[in-house]
């Protein structure tokens, strides 16, 4: 957003279209290898990703696909085919086909915006999108306080001119002003379309106040059927943000950490000590409840001190 490079709100929101950016990682890596970058105060290489420097598809590092208006979230479909960009200040979502963007980089697509295969109205204040693996997208509508379920293929058909294509499948009220959203394994090839979680930025009357910070609301929704069903509310900290849902059997748990995985770990309290190299001082110590291997240590004013603490409780 703010492709206008504005400072005031009225300037930042003056353009009807902004941009969704796609980065050509291979070209960026080649540019860095060739020394075509700058540094600003550190050694991190910074390539030129400005719009002016990336208009020629043959050399572009970045593709600027135009989207309306002050776009917010962009999310990839489980098959990796489409990227859905939410309009925020536009009641639309823009569906961009990745292969067409790659065709533009390769000189096979003349107009970059021809990678837009759908741009449809879904509601007021679209922010983020999740997927069920069955071809449906779920977008949060901040101003409408809703989640809208819509079918991507039907949206593409509608965009092409089929006005009989009913792309909106369902809507459900949430409480209130939803932002981040995710479905079970949503942006992976294993999306299973069972559950949806949504972070609502305001709970309003949903929970009793418990102190200076009023709890906001995360809601769990069943998306296994045609209609969405609200299952549960959960009070959460303010401004709930990104989260994922995944199957617990893919987690490989550990009961005890392997100290060999940490090259700086102190494996024995006898290795504790203060080690000086000029003004650089490294302090190594261990802890094992309720004590530390060193209760105190002394350094000089002006020293640069690195403290390495390893817990040896079992």
Which residues does each predicted region cover?
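Predominantly soluble domains enriched in secretory-pathway, periplasmic, or organellar proteins
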Residues: 1-273, 280-282, 304
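Extracytoplasmic copper-binding redox domains, predominantly the cupredoxin/blue-copper superfamily
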Residues: 263-314
């Amino acid at each position: 957003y703010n492709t206008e490079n504005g400072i005031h709100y009225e300037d930042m929101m003056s353009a009807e279209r902004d941009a969704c950016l796609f980065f050509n990682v291979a070209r960026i890596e080649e540019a860095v290898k060739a020394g075509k970058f700058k540094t600003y105060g550190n050694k991190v290489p910074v390539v030129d990703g400005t719009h002016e420097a990336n208009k020629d598809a043959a050399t572009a590092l970045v593709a600027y696909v135009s989207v309306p208006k002050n776009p917010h979230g962009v999310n990839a479909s489980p098959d990796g085919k489409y990227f859905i960009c939410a309009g925020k200040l536009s009641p639309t979502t823009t569906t961009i086909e990745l292969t067409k963007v790659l065709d533009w980089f390769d000189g096979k697509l003349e107009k970059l915006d021809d990678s837009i295969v759908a741009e449809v109205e879904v509601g007021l204040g679209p922010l983020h999108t999740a997927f069920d693996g069955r071809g449906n997208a779920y977008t949060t509508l901040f101003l409408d306080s809703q989640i809208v379920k819509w079918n991507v293929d039907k949206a593409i058909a509608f965009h092409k001119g089929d006005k009989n294509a009913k792309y909106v499948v369902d809507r459900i009220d949430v409480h209130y002003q939803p932002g981040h959203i995710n479905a079970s394994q949503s942006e992976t090839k294993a999306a299973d379309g069972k559950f949806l979680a949504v972070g609502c930025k305001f709970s309003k009357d949903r929970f009793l106040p418990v102190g200076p910070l009023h709890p906001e609301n995360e809601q769990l929704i069943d998306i296994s059927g045609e209609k969405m069903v609200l299952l549960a509310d959960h009070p959460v900290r303010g401004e709930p943000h990104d989260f994922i849902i995944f199957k617990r059997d893919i987690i490989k748990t550990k009961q005890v950490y392997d100290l060999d995985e940490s090259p700086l770990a102190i494996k024995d309290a006898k290795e504790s000590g203060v080690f000086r190299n000029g003004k650089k001082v490294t302090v190594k110590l261990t802890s094992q409840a309720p004590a530390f291997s060193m209760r105190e240590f002394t350094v000089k004013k002006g020293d640069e001190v690195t403290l390495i603490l390893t817990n040896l409780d079992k």
